[in-house]
Amino acid sequence: MKYVIAGLGNPGPTYENTRHNIGFKIVDALASTILFSQERFALRAELKYKGRQVILIKPQTFMNLSGKAIKYWLEKEKIDIENLLVITDDIMLPFGKIRLRPKGSHGGHNGLRNIEEELQTQNFPRLRFGIGNNFPKGRQVDYVLGQWSSEELNVLPEKIEKAKQCVLDFVFLGIDRAMNLHNS
């Protein structure tokens, strides 16, 4: 079995430690000792997990155009859409809470919206990582593109580790069992 795990984020050092780049951070945790290579539309790494081939990508097309990279890698690797997992930030979830779903709407997230447009479906698995919504009205962009607070940074590694385990359970156990284990 082959999987594509796509962590959403924006390329470059300006965005590296922002809330919006949590997808990149989780994919980095999965790759821990594996180097990413610059390939078409994405940084790519590959690992084996319990007999499964897992292709990790960090689209380099910027968040709002992530669909182009994801579509390319699904087609290139001949991977079915149910073996795709998109990891993204979510302001509607409290900080650190994760929610795994087999499908759903973009919920106003422009990266997910673009993926839906490129794939022409909402029926793909996604893991949403809560970044909270502690911002004044009209300041959403500043918040999601902002750095983590010191309080968040203190517990972020633990939260990323839980998200990483959810991804591995998705790959090995399937989406239903992974949802039962990780959604609360």
List each model region and its residues.
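Nucleotide and nucleotide-moiety/phosphate-recognizing core
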Residues: 1-103, 113-127, 134-139, 146, ...
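Hydrophobic alpha-helical segments within soluble ligand-binding/sensing domains
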Residues: 108-111
